Amino acid sequence: MTILQRLAALRALMKEKGVWACIVPGTDPHASEYMAEHWTEMSWITGFLGETGTAVITLDQALLWTDSRYYLQAEAELKGTTVELMRESDIDCPSIPEWLVTTQEQGTKNQDTKVAVNPEMYSVNGYRELKETLQEGGLELVSIDLISPLWTEGRPAIPTSLLYEYEEKYTGESVESKLQRVR
């Protein structure tokens, strides 16, 4: 599938689920700096291969927020995709929640107000913060993974590496002690 076909498929699924916008962060469930290919959902939906970015797809727009380190790369990789670059390092660039609320207020009131995210890609605090900010602007955050049902062909598997234990001399605390603290 091309980027345009992926965006069309995502929008069709969004309509089916009653979703107005979908946020696709360039992260994994562990907030890892170096993530496994399986979790490169933002790259898959936009074509942008940079290490930092977040995509927002609405029923009629597609945008990518990234910082100044990736502007040139993003411009080149987004060419021909209909994905608009949002230069988040620029002083006048709105945050994603600000953009969503403003865009909703400026003419899409007749559409649904649901904003979907895959909750696995957010920390608990990050999710709560986003939910609260969107609610204040009249939008509803919903937990729906909209990418996995679409990215079925050629998606790399989740790695199955063995676990290993860091010795206490490196961590400063035993496994037993850590487990006791969380129980």
Predicted regions: what is each one?
Residues T2-Q104, N118, Y122-R183:
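N-terminal accessory/capping or targeting/presequence segment of soluble
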Residues T103-T113:
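Short, basic, low-complexity termini and linkers enriched in Ser/Thr/Gly/Pro
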